[in-house]
Amino acid sequence: MWHNDHMSIEKVSTQLANLPPAWMSRVSGGGGAMGNAAEIRKMLGEPLPQLVDPNSLSKGIAAFFGPRGLLERLRRKLSLISRKKGGKILPAKNTIASVDEDDNLYVGVDFLEQFGEDEDLIAGILAHEWGHMMSDLPRKVDWSHLTWDQLHALRRDEEGDADGFAGRAMFLMGYSPKAMVGFLKEMDRRRKNKKIPCHKYHNHATRAAILMESYEAERRAYNFAKRLFFNENKTPGVKIGRIIGSG
């Protein structure tokens, strides 16, 4: 069963309230070492996207970046899930989305023009970038001694972790990962047609599996926590007492 009723911030808060306290520490554990992840990108020759003047945006695209726009609503939900506020959301070009060491999120204007009506996909893309903010790479580490292959392997692991966070976050926000999986498949098809090698990501099948498995794992954890810690009338306490008493 897909979780498709795109949730308001209040509903996301209710979802989190149905989970035991230990869950949050698991989702938000580590985190905050984005500076090193950004440094690895720089070493691999990946500059930050070029900003677009907000005043040059069409009315429809500008609405995405407004205080009541979709991107801000998603930022609030992801902030609630991760306990990370995030930085500014900035319009950019020649990119889908990216995040920098200050947690500023760059979202591609061309991407929004093409896929702006696909809220599931936009949520998945932002959740993936938010996952980079949760990086557990240690701080103040010099990566310059690593070979190119080692740097690419480290980057693939980072991307896999971000996909895993995205899958979990999409469940909690009420979005289906199907659009994200389909988008990755299409990007992979285009890359292969152009015979462009890709070293920084796992293959499409692996990324799709990470997204789907993490989504389903969060759904199972959520449903199990509801059964374990809450009664049918959604009040806590009695079931916990029974479990402790039966021990």
Which functions belong to the PLM regions below?
Residues 8-16, 20-60, 66-99, 104, ...:
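C-terminal capping/extension segments of zinc metalloprotease domains
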Residues 27, 123-128:
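Short, functionally critical alpha-helical segments immediately adjacent to catalytic or ligand/cofactor-binding
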Residues 111, 117-120, 129-145, 172-175:
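Catalytic Zn2+-binding segment of zinc metalloproteases
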Residues 120-121, 195:
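Alpha-helical hydrophobic/aromatic positions enriched in membrane-embedded helices and signal peptides
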Residues 121-122, 141, 145, 149-153, ...:
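Flexible, glycine-rich surface segments
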Residues 104-108, 124-125:
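Soluble periplasmic/extracytoplasmic beta-strand elements of cell-envelope proteins
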